[in-house]
Amino acid sequence: MAMSKPEQPAHTGSGPLFERRYWVDVQHPRQPADALLRHIERHLPDFSSDLLADFEKSKGTEGRLAVGDEYSIKILGPWNGDVRVTEVGTDFFELTTLESHPEAGRIRFSLRPHATLSDTVRFEIHSWARSRDGLVAFTYDTLGLGRRVQQQTWEVFCQRVADFSGGLLLGPVQVETIKEGEEVD
Protein backbone atom coordinates (compact mmCIF):
# COMPACT_ATOMS: atom_id res chain seq x y z
CA MET A 1 0.00 0.00 0.00
CA ALA A 2 1.36 3.41 -0.97
CA MET A 3 2.27 5.85 1.76
CA SER A 4 -0.02 8.83 2.08
CA LYS A 5 1.38 12.17 1.00
CA PRO A 6 2.14 14.65 3.76
CA GLU A 7 -0.21 17.57 4.28
CA GLN A 8 0.72 20.89 2.68
CA PRO A 9 -0.47 23.59 5.11
CA ALA A 10 -0.61 27.26 4.10
CA HIS A 11 2.61 28.20 5.93
CA THR A 12 4.57 25.89 3.58
CA GLY A 13 3.37 27.74 0.46
CA SER A 14 4.60 30.78 -1.43
CA GLY A 15 3.20 34.28 -1.89
CA PRO A 16 0.28 35.95 -0.15
CA LEU A 17 -2.32 34.07 1.84
CA PHE A 18 -5.79 34.29 0.29
CA GLU A 19 -8.98 33.79 2.25
CA ARG A 20 -11.87 33.08 -0.10
CA ARG A 21 -15.57 32.60 0.58
CA TYR A 22 -18.23 31.38 -1.82
CA TRP A 23 -21.77 31.14 -0.51
CA VAL A 24 -25.37 30.78 -1.49
CA ASP A 25 -28.58 31.24 0.54
CA VAL A 26 -31.52 28.91 -0.08
CA GLN A 27 -35.01 29.39 1.33
CA HIS A 28 -37.45 26.51 1.94
CA PRO A 29 -35.03 23.63 1.19
CA ARG A 30 -36.80 20.26 0.82
CA GLN A 31 -34.68 18.72 3.58
CA PRO A 32 -33.03 19.89 6.80
CA ALA A 33 -29.50 21.33 6.65
CA ASP A 34 -27.88 18.33 8.38
CA ALA A 35 -29.47 15.82 5.97
CA LEU A 36 -28.42 17.93 2.99
CA LEU A 37 -24.82 18.17 4.25
CA ARG A 38 -24.67 14.38 4.83
CA HIS A 39 -25.79 13.91 1.20
CA ILE A 40 -23.05 16.28 -0.03
CA GLU A 41 -20.48 14.35 2.03
CA ARG A 42 -21.57 11.00 0.57
CA HIS A 43 -21.70 12.33 -3.01
CA LEU A 44 -18.96 15.00 -3.07
CA PRO A 45 -17.91 14.39 -6.72
CA ASP A 46 -21.51 14.95 -7.94
CA PHE A 47 -21.42 18.61 -6.87
CA SER A 48 -18.21 19.50 -8.69
CA SER A 49 -17.96 20.04 -12.43
CA ASP A 50 -15.88 17.12 -13.68
CA LEU A 51 -14.63 19.36 -16.50
CA LEU A 52 -13.19 21.86 -14.00
CA ALA A 53 -12.33 19.72 -10.96
CA ASP A 54 -13.03 15.99 -11.08
CA PHE A 55 -13.02 14.51 -7.54
CA GLU A 56 -12.18 10.81 -7.19
CA LYS A 57 -11.98 9.12 -3.80
CA SER A 58 -8.54 7.53 -3.48
CA LYS A 59 -8.67 6.47 0.18
CA GLY A 60 -11.68 5.67 2.35
CA THR A 61 -15.06 4.00 2.04
CA GLU A 62 -17.34 5.01 -0.84
CA GLY A 63 -20.64 6.53 0.24
CA ARG A 64 -19.36 8.18 3.41
CA LEU A 65 -16.93 10.92 4.45
CA ALA A 66 -14.53 10.40 7.37
CA VAL A 67 -11.38 11.99 8.74
CA GLY A 68 -8.43 10.50 6.85
CA ASP A 69 -10.29 9.97 3.57
CA GLU A 70 -8.44 11.28 0.52
CA TYR A 71 -9.51 12.55 -2.89
CA SER A 72 -7.49 12.95 -6.08
CA ILE A 73 -8.67 15.97 -8.02
CA LYS A 74 -8.09 16.34 -11.75
CA ILE A 75 -8.14 20.10 -12.23
CA LEU A 76 -8.45 21.84 -15.61
CA GLY A 77 -4.93 22.65 -16.79
CA PRO A 78 -1.77 21.34 -15.12
CA TRP A 79 -3.29 21.68 -11.64
CA ASN A 80 -4.02 18.16 -10.38
CA GLY A 81 -3.77 17.63 -6.64
CA ASP A 82 -4.81 15.58 -3.65
CA VAL A 83 -6.70 16.53 -0.49
CA ARG A 84 -7.38 14.80 2.83
CA VAL A 85 -10.45 15.10 5.04
CA THR A 86 -9.11 16.54 8.31
CA GLU A 87 -12.33 17.47 10.15
CA VAL A 88 -15.97 16.44 10.01
CA GLY A 89 -18.50 18.22 12.25
CA THR A 90 -22.27 18.34 12.48
CA ASP A 91 -22.53 21.29 10.08
CA PHE A 92 -19.18 21.27 8.22
CA PHE A 93 -16.28 19.26 6.86
CA GLU A 94 -12.77 20.38 6.04
CA LEU A 95 -10.16 19.28 3.49
CA THR A 96 -6.42 19.99 3.64
CA THR A 97 -4.20 20.04 0.56
CA LEU A 98 -1.50 17.37 0.24
CA GLU A 99 2.03 17.62 -1.12
CA SER A 100 2.10 18.58 -4.85
CA HIS A 101 -1.39 20.19 -4.83
CA PRO A 102 -1.13 23.62 -6.57
CA GLU A 103 -2.27 25.28 -3.35
CA ALA A 104 -1.12 24.96 0.25
CA GLY A 105 -3.95 25.30 2.73
CA ARG A 106 -7.39 24.13 3.75
CA ILE A 107 -10.99 24.48 2.64
CA ARG A 108 -14.15 24.18 4.73
CA PHE A 109 -17.63 23.32 3.42
CA SER A 110 -20.48 24.27 5.76
CA LEU A 111 -24.26 24.26 5.70
CA ARG A 112 -26.01 26.16 8.47
CA PRO A 113 -29.32 27.84 9.19
CA HIS A 114 -29.24 31.43 7.92
CA ALA A 115 -28.43 33.94 10.68
CA THR A 116 -31.52 36.13 10.13
CA LEU A 117 -33.93 34.43 7.68
CA SER A 118 -36.26 31.66 8.83
CA ASP A 119 -36.46 28.37 6.88
CA THR A 120 -33.29 29.40 5.03
CA VAL A 121 -29.86 27.77 4.89
CA ARG A 122 -26.47 29.10 3.85
CA PHE A 123 -24.06 26.79 2.06
CA GLU A 124 -20.53 28.16 2.20
CA ILE A 125 -17.11 27.14 0.91
CA HIS A 126 -14.36 28.94 2.84
CA SER A 127 -10.67 28.51 2.00
CA TRP A 128 -7.39 29.72 3.48
CA ALA A 129 -4.53 29.05 1.07
CA ARG A 130 -1.48 30.31 -0.75
CA SER A 131 0.23 28.97 -3.85
CA ARG A 132 2.46 25.91 -3.51
CA ASP A 133 5.47 27.69 -5.03
CA GLY A 134 6.56 30.73 -7.02
CA LEU A 135 5.67 29.28 -10.43
CA VAL A 136 2.14 28.44 -9.31
CA ALA A 137 1.86 31.90 -7.70
CA PHE A 138 2.83 33.54 -10.99
CA THR A 139 0.45 31.58 -13.24
CA TYR A 140 -2.35 31.41 -10.69
CA ASP A 141 -2.33 34.87 -9.13
CA THR A 142 -0.32 37.12 -11.46
CA LEU A 143 -1.77 35.77 -14.72
CA GLY A 144 -5.04 34.78 -13.03
CA LEU A 145 -5.37 31.46 -14.89
CA GLY A 146 -5.90 29.09 -11.96
CA ARG A 147 -7.90 31.62 -9.98
CA ARG A 148 -10.62 31.83 -12.65
CA VAL A 149 -10.92 28.04 -12.87
CA GLN A 150 -11.09 27.81 -9.08
CA GLN A 151 -13.79 30.47 -8.78
CA GLN A 152 -15.88 28.82 -11.48
CA THR A 153 -15.43 25.41 -9.81
CA TRP A 154 -16.75 26.59 -6.44
CA GLU A 155 -19.54 28.69 -7.97
CA VAL A 156 -20.77 25.57 -9.83
CA PHE A 157 -20.50 23.56 -6.59
CA CYS A 158 -22.62 26.13 -4.69
CA GLN A 159 -25.17 26.26 -7.52
CA ARG A 160 -25.49 22.46 -7.59
CA VAL A 161 -26.03 22.36 -3.82
CA ALA A 162 -28.76 25.00 -4.16
CA ASP A 163 -30.38 23.09 -7.05
CA PHE A 164 -30.26 19.78 -5.16
CA SER A 165 -31.82 21.37 -2.05
CA GLY A 166 -35.00 22.03 -4.02
CA GLY A 167 -35.39 25.40 -2.34
CA LEU A 168 -35.54 28.97 -3.60
CA LEU A 169 -32.15 30.46 -4.45
CA LEU A 170 -31.91 33.95 -2.92
CA GLY A 171 -29.65 35.61 -5.47
CA PRO A 172 -26.48 34.52 -7.28
CA VAL A 173 -23.51 32.80 -5.67
CA GLN A 174 -21.59 35.38 -3.61
CA VAL A 175 -17.78 35.52 -3.74
CA GLU A 176 -15.41 37.32 -1.37
CA THR A 177 -11.60 37.34 -1.51
CA ILE A 178 -9.32 38.72 1.17
CA LYS A 179 -5.61 38.91 0.34
CA GLU A 180 -3.39 38.85 3.41
CA GLY A 181 -2.93 42.44 4.56
CA GLU A 182 -5.69 43.84 2.34
CA GLU A 183 -9.33 44.72 2.85
CA VAL A 184 -12.22 42.72 1.39
CA ASP A 185 -12.61 43.13 -2.40
Stretch-by-stretch model annotation:
Residues L17-W23, F92, T120-R122:
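Intrinsic-disorder/low-complexity, polar/charged segments enriched in Ser/Thr/Lys/Arg/Asp/Glu/Gln
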Residues G13-S14, V83-T86, G134-L135:
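Short amphipathic alpha-helical segments, especially helix-boundary/capping motifs
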Residues I73-L76, G181-D185:
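N-terminal leader/presequence segments that precede the conserved core
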Residues R130-V184:
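A conserved amphipathic terminal alpha-helix motif
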Residues S100-R148:
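Beta-strand/loop substructures that line and gate deep hydrophobic ligand-binding cavities in soluble
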Residues M1-K74:
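Hydrophobic ligand-binding cavity/cleft-lining segments
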Residues H39, H43, F47, H101, ...:
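Conserved short hydrophobic interaction patches
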Residues K74-D119:
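Hydrophobic-ligand binding "helix-grip"
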